[in-house]
């Protein structure tokens, strides 16, 4: 804290008793004597007014209680980069030598920060530092030009999140001294970005990862700055209130990951503006209020030219409630992984199974690998579940008579393909099951592992409507054996010694006349 004010005090980021704010006013506030700073708090609940006092407006706040007047001597204006770096990383013989180290992420890269507990003699020398974290160190400026480059020229990864940086120009003054800079996290610095494209320099010529979460940047400002990031691969823009206002032309063309999560102004029409980034593989759209998406260039069963390289899509915590959303995702030519947790659509027990059936090339769902037998089961169940609807809409096992309606094909774009893959559902499969009656439909069966004589014979009660596929799934969990390796047959208590194979996974136990007291034989 100091009574000496910076020359450019208006717009400066400051910290007061652990709370962060931006200086909006400096001067007298009559009738109280002395110098005052008018600040707008990041947390509006911390303030008392909207920037006015006794009828006079001294500055404006976005929130009616976002402002306060404070004395300069209680305000922390921060310190330069190198001073903060030395405080954190230079080895000392003081009582706090055993400060903890911590693990953090800068973009998708895991970084082990160097606490005093892990510092070696070599690492204590600033020149040897490569990955650093100055999180919450009150860094506000670059300091004397050239000193950073001289003291620590080998830094590649920098976490400057939650500091007191005020402008993008100040960031440039730091970055231009780090010639090998690859990853930079500036999250939670309320930065003033240039309103026009800055002069192109080589400042960020090696930068691959840039994190700008909660910085207040707009999409227009992103595009103004982007030409200065020629090799950028990962860009994080979470929680900025961003609206995508224009298509990136000659900018962000090397981008592989884009995080737009928690920007509720983004909708499906805006996503079309970033749909032709040629190398975009990962797109993070969690918590933006998304409910629909549409790729108008692709008909049913065709692939879109939009998002050509997209392999991983995250749409957690949105408002997705219609299966048409999932149908559209099957049009993405490269999509292999999807995360869509905590959406209205995914609350049902069968939701994940239906998603697997609807998106043919999907290999990972909600961070879980989709095994071949799981896909087969999901597709067979889907084919059976909508078989009656398919028949009513004009579907037929005879190819010459198979003419399902356009409405059905729109709702179930992959159904015809599944019929080609597994065959059309048979009449027996589509019969309505009789109402469940516990007394005559619950079978008590013995389960014997034929090629594992040491295995104890089990006894289970199973519904006679349970399909062979579901029985295999149950046995797979009980015996810790993959479903694909299980072979099932049974011996009837009425015909000892005769073994009947259960070869059709889609048929229920009752189809094979399995009865109470019979024995299921399991091999693998």
From Swiss-Prot:
Positions of post-translational N6-acetyllysine modification: 460
Domain of life (superkingdom): Eukaryota
Keyword hit for ATP-binding: no
Residues in CAP-Gly domain copies: 27-71
GO biological process: adult locomotory behavior; axonogenesis; developmental growth; microtubule cytoskeleton organization; mitotic spindle organization; muscle atrophy; peripheral nervous system neuron axonogenesis; post-chaperonin tubulin folding pathway
Family annotation (Gene3D superfamilies): CAP Gly-rich-like domain (2.30.30.190), Phosphatidylinositol 3-kinase Catalytic Subunit, Chain A, domain 1 (3.10.20.90), Ribonuclease Inhibitor (3.80.10.10)
Subunit structure: Supercomplex made of cofactors A to E. Cofactors A and D function by capturing and stabilizing tubulin in a quasi-native conformation. Cofactor E binds to the cofactor D-tubulin complex; interaction with cofactor C then causes the release of tubulin polypeptides that are committed to the native state. Cofactors B and E can form a heterodimer which binds to alpha-tubulin and enhances their ability to dissociate tubulin heterodimers. Interacts with TBCD.
Function, in words: Tubulin-folding protein; involved in the second step of the tubulin folding pathway and in the regulation of tubulin heterodimer dissociation. Required for correct organization of microtubule cytoskeleton and mitotic splindle, and maintenance of the neuronal microtubule network.
Protein name in UniProt: Tubulin-specific chaperone E
Species: Rattus norvegicus
Gene name of this polypeptide: Tbce
């Amino acid at each position: 804290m100091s009574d000496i004010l910076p020359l450019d005090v208006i717009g400066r980021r400051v910290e007061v008793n652990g709370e962060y704010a931006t200086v909006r006013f400096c001067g007298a506030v009559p009738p109280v004597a002395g110098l005052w700073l008018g600040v707008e708090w990041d947390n509006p609940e911390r303030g008392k007014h909207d920037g006015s006092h006794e009828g006079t407006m001294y500055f404006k706040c976005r929130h009616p209680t976002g402002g306060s007047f404070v004395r300069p001597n209680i305000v922390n204006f921060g310190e330069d980069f190198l001073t903060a770096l030395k405080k954190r990383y230079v080895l000392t013989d003081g009582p706090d030598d055993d400060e903890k180290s911590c693990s953090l992420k800068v973009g998708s890269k895991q970084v082990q920060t160097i606490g005093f507990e892990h510092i070696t003699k070599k690492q204590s020398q600033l020149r040897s530092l490569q990955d650093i974290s100055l999180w919450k160190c009150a860094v506000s400026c670059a300091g004397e030009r050239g000193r950073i480059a001289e003291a620590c020229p080998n830094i590649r990864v920098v976490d400057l999140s939650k500091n007191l940086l005020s402008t993008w120009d100040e960031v440039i003054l730091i970055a231009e001294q780090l010639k090998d800079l690859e990853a930079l996290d500036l999250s939670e610095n309320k930065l003033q970005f240039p309103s026009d494209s800055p002069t192109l320099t080589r400042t960020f010529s090696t930068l691959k990862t840039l994190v700008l979460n909660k910085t207040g940047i707009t999409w227009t400002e992103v595009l103004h700055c982007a030409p200065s990031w020629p090799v950028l691969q990962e860009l994080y823009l979470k929680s900025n209130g961003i609206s995508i206002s224009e298509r990136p032309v000659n900018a962000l063309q090397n981008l592989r990951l884009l995080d737009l999560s928690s920007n509720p102004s983004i909708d499906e029409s805006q996503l079309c503006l970033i749909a032709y980034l040629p190398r975009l593989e990962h797109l993070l759209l969690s918590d933006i209020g998304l409910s629909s998406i549409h790729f108008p260039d692709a008909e049913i069963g065709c692939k879109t030219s939009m998002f050509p390289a997209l392999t991983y899509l995250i749409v957690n915590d949105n408002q997705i409630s219609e299966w048409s959303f999932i149908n559209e995702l099957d049009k993405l030519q490269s999509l292999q992984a999807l995360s869509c947790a905590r959406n209205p659509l995914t609350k049902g027990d069968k939701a994940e199974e239906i998603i697997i059936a609807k998106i043919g090339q999907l290999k990972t769902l909600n961070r879980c690998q989709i095994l071949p037998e799981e896909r087969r089961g999901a597709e067979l169940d889907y084919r059976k579940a909508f078989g009656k609807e398919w028949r009513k809409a004009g579907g037929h096992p005879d190819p010459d008579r198979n003419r399902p309606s356009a409405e059905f094909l729109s709702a179930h774009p992959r159904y015809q393909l599944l019929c080609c893959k597994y065959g059309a559902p048979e009449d027996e499969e589509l019969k309505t099951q009789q109402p469940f009656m516990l007394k005559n439909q619950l079978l008590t069966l013995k389960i014997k592992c034929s090629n594992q004589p040491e295995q104890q014979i089990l006894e289970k009660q199973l519904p006679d409507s349970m399909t062979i596929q579901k029985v295999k799934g149950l046995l797979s969990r009980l015996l810790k054996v993959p479903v694909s390796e299980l072979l099932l047959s049974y011996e009837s208590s009425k015909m000892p010694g005769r073994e009947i194979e259960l070869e059709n996974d889609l048929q229920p136990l009752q189809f094979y006349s399995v009865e109470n007291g019979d024995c299921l034989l399991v091999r693998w």
